[in-house]
Amino acid sequence: MLQLLVLKIEDPGCFWVIIKGCSPFLDHDVDYQKLNSAMNDFYNSTCQDIEIKPLTLEEGQVCVVYCEELKCWCRAIVKSITSSADQYLAECFLVDFAKNIPVKSKNIRVVVESFMQLPYRAKKFSLYCTKPVTLHIDFCRDSTDIVPAKKWDNAAIQYFQNLLKATTQVEARLCAVEEDTFEVYLYVTIKDEKVCVNDDLVAKNYACYMSPTKNKNLDYLEKPRLNIKSAPSFNKLNPALTLWPMFLQGKDVQGMEDSHGVNFPAQSLQHTWCKGIVGDLRPTATAQDKAVKCNMDSLRDSPKDKSEKKHHCISLKDTNKRVESSVYWPAKRGITIYADPDVPEASALSQKSNEKPLRLTEKKEYDEKNSCVKLLQFLNPDPLRADGISDLQQLQKLKGLQPPVVVLRNKIKPCLTIDSSPLSADLKKALQRNKFPGPSHTESYSWPPIARGCDVVVISHCESNPLLYLLPVLTVLQTGACYKSLPSRNGPLAVIVCPGWKKAQFIFELLGEYSMSSRPLHPVLLTIGLHKEEAKNTKLPRGCDVIVTTPYSLLRLLACQSLLFLRLCHLILDEVEVLFLEANEQMFAILDNFKKNIEVEERESAPHQIVAVGVHWNKHIEHLIKEFMNDPYIVITAMEEAALYGNVQQVVHLCLECEKTSSLLQALDFIPSQAQKTLIFTCSVAETEIVCKVVESSSIFCLKMHKEMIFNLQNVLEQWKKKLSSGSQIILALTDDCVPLLAITDATCVIHFSFPASPKVFGGRLYCMSDHFHAEQGSPAEQGDKKAKSVLLLTEKDASHAVGVLRYLERADAKVPAELYEFTAGVLEAKEDKKAGRPLCPYLKAFGFCKDKRICPDRHRINPETDLPRKLSSQALPSFGYIKIIPFYILNATNYFGRIVDKHMDLYATLNAEMNEYFKDSNKTTVEKVEKFGLYGLAEKTLFHRVQVLEVNQKEDAWALDDILVEFIDEGRTGLVTRDQLLHLPEHFHTLPPQAVEFIVCRVKPADNEIEWNPKVTRYIHHKIVGKLHDAKVILALGNTVWIDPMVHITNLSSLKTSVIDYNVRAEILSMGMGIDNPEHIEQLKKLREDAKIPACEESLSQTPPRVTGTSPAQDQDHPSEEQGGQGTPPAEDAACLQSPQPEDTGAEGGAESKTSSENQKPGGYLVFKRWLSSNR
């Protein structure tokens, strides 16, 4: 949606606006401000001596005029010219302000080409397909009728103006561009209600919808195009293949399904100012190849009529019928396997009477081709090879793309289109406005049971999209009647639990966007810290029906205000496997509370639903299903995860590449107790032949199938499908490209002789055993030898996949051989060796640990070559001692960039004074050519900085102002500047190395297993410390990073000869309840340094702590001494505790549960700086 600012209204067919926000149609506001400034400077100063006046004036001429009202020079177009006594008077239209003004010829100038680089800011808009109407009286028939008119009447214009005046927000959805006019659907927000202006004018009989005529030169962005010549089903399909028996059995051709697809010819917009429009307006995801997402008249009809259209699908036999194909899979122990029917997900055509000639032409061409096809079929019933492609490719083309499969516990009829989805009408309209392409494969199976209020578990690779559950849950919440039996009190109906604050923030924003298309839900984002008072004082707004939170925050609120959740009906678990992994106890406590509440008799008629969505299956989800769900629907579209759900036995054999064949024979069961069907997967034809020979050498019958044996497909299938007696077995060696053709689902064992190329290929192999997936974990006696088995041969060639294999086996609760652990450890060591050039892991630096080294791309070892403390001048960074620092750039609550201040020899202060002296003497020479990584000067108010160029966004014209990303090398922050702000920096200012240093406050980490600081903690610390001088003790220095503990702000009371500690940064973080103690931080870093054998650096800028005596006369009123648990400590005790040995490590790991050391208190106690810093931790 485009955000608009209306400048001028002529009528609904012509109004002028400015496009706001980040849109591909405009440059930033700052660009126009700089353009206006440059124009005024140029025409006011440069042109005083030489006035650039046009030699002639013509209508339509572009020029620059002086506007008396705006007091500035503006770009304009001459509309008309009139002559007066002494000079000409021109009526000009200001293209950036949408104003018509009279201008004297003396105030008109020739426009310089560089001032025409930016597009006109005022853009002409029109309501799309919305035309004026008038009352037509037929005297002959004595009747009246409302018919289209040529111009808008005054009442319509007045109503349109009143609408736009009363609105608080104007938005538009671009539909077409005609010459210089944008045709849009216009939306206005009035009293928190969004109204489509096009619909409103039509509903009130001020206008009507009219299809664009054929002679209009429109570039449609949404209009579907039907091009018979390009339809692959008619021209690109080999006619001899069309009526081949396999095709008639329901295996449609992919090209047939795409023959009437829609396209979006947005590339027809060639305006220079429209760069990026295609990427901005196309749907957020591509539709599946077989789906047709739009109607032919989707833009021509009123949105109210769209849902009433009848959809028609075109097939080879009848234009009003469709070919459906479905695959039946036998159900085993409550599991049903489905394949999507090969039908379009939406209608293919819906045409009006004015398109009948097109349809007749299409039908005629179709009938002609159909006759030829029947003749060819009669003459040659066997399929012909087309275009010289292989037999395997030909068959794959005939069968089409294999429909994605899904494993279900209960049968679900998928919703293949938005229209057939169980979503509310308002949500459907919102999705259509947002160009939603239609439900994905997973969404088509997930939406129906969730919208019915059932318990649902969804395991899919697309879990990161919250619309998977958000839209159907919003639909359920619209049905207010089912909640009437609930207590009439304040409290949420639905709670969405996310693994961290960042995901919760994302879902909350998405919820806010789509809840506008439903009744008011008043959603709330809850992140509650460790303070009990915070949970007790939390108040929900009246009418709050949805809460988005984390497990720890929710449990704290439950502990203090459990009555708030008496109305809770829907519990949604986002990234369920992560929730159970990182907050297992908290999750089961939440589930127990939910189960206890819904078992109350008064709530029997109210809905109770648990929706769990994740990427991976694990044992905790199985426990969730058994203990807390009622006959849930289970939807799994990731086949490798379905194998875990189906309890497929996972076995890994480690061997050398040269020993694979012997390991294969060891994996085979030569004397099975039950009938055994085994598949051996290979990666090539040669490998298939070798495997077949090896197996047959052991006197076991072995079939084979690869692309060169496609002629034998039917024979192989017949052999495979034969019923086996007990104790007998059949083995088939095949390549992965044969899997879709064979469609095997009854294998009992799969051996991966070659490593699968991707998880999808791995899942496809395991799906061949789907008939033997077990829905419930039975006893070994019940399962016996019926349990499906997967055997993976892992060699040294597959070393890069060892970590992923180990993770999969751990989730499967499989027996992991000790050799695999050793092998994986060696692989990880080798990976770490390759990371020598990578930066040190930011989490390792900030907290002393990395959450998952196995997948982290950064380095986790200290490199003696690159991690030696950097030199700021003649001395290196201090590795110990006391320093004074000024933080300038705050990355997060504990990570800052700033400068070390040396009171004995501050080289930067000297440099800064010299720079100020140099630049104030008119030495501000701007840079003509900017080089990447070049060093320049930059003026900010009265200060001058050294900056290094990181990126240059260079524009074509010299007058254009470049966007340049620079780093302030003495402060650590980055910023965007323009070329004219950069100053030439003499070489003698380059000699001092960059003074910006990274500081990390030690021994504190985010609470609740988070790895990133909550933004409100970062904001608080930023406001507290930025730009202020602090005292700190250095613990460690590596590269350009200094670890400090503590970091305090001190006020010197010279009159009392006393120093007062205002605050300790670490204590401030702990006092907010969002952080906990991290005593292992320093020890882990020092251990890494010892392992790297980096010698202690003797060169140091360390300072001795100041000699101070006395205490603070009064406690800081802004920071009362109050422990996080609510208990206060007298100043004397505070000082005593801080001076005792190891005063800050004696607390519990929570660090904020009122049992930690006194340093975890609110700051404000009376501390002597020397003793406090010298205390032995």
Swiss-Prot record:
GO terms for biological process: fertilization; germ-line stem cell division; male meiotic nuclear division; piRNA processing; spermatogenesis; transposable element silencing by piRNA-mediated DNA methylation. It comes from Homo sapiens (Human). Keywords: ATP-binding, Developmental protein, Differentiation, Helicase, Hydrolase, Meiosis, Nucleotide-binding, Repeat, RNA-mediated gene silencing, Spermatogenesis. It comes from the Eukaryota. The gene is TDRD12. Residues 56-118, 900-999 form the Tudor domain. InterPro entries: DEAD/DEAH_box_helicase_dom, P-loop_NTPase, SNase_OB-fold_sf, Tudor, Tudor_TDRD12_rpt1. This is Putative ATP-dependent RNA helicase TDRD12. Pfam families: DEAD, TUDOR. GO terms for cellular component: PET complex. ATP binds at residues 460-467. Its EC number is 3.6.4.13. A motif (DEAH box) lies at residues 574-577. GO terms for molecular function: ATP binding; ATP hydrolysis activity; nucleic acid binding; RNA helicase activity. Residues 1098-1177 are annotated as: Disordered. It catalyses: ATP + H2O = ADP + phosphate + H(+). Residues 1100-1115 have a biased composition (Polar residues). Residues 447-635 form the Helicase ATP-binding domain. Probable ATP-binding RNA helicase required during spermatogenesis to repress transposable elements and preventing their mobilization, which is essential for the germline integrity. Acts via the piRNA metabolic process, which mediates the repression of transposable elements during meiosis by forming complexes composed of piRNAs and Piwi proteins and governs the methylation and subsequent repression of transposons. Involved in the secondary piRNAs metabolic process. PANTHER family: ATP-DEPENDENT RNA HELICASE TDRD12-RELATED (PTHR22655:SF2). SUPFAM superfamilies: P-loop containing nucleoside triphosphate hydrolases, Tudor/PWWP/MBT.
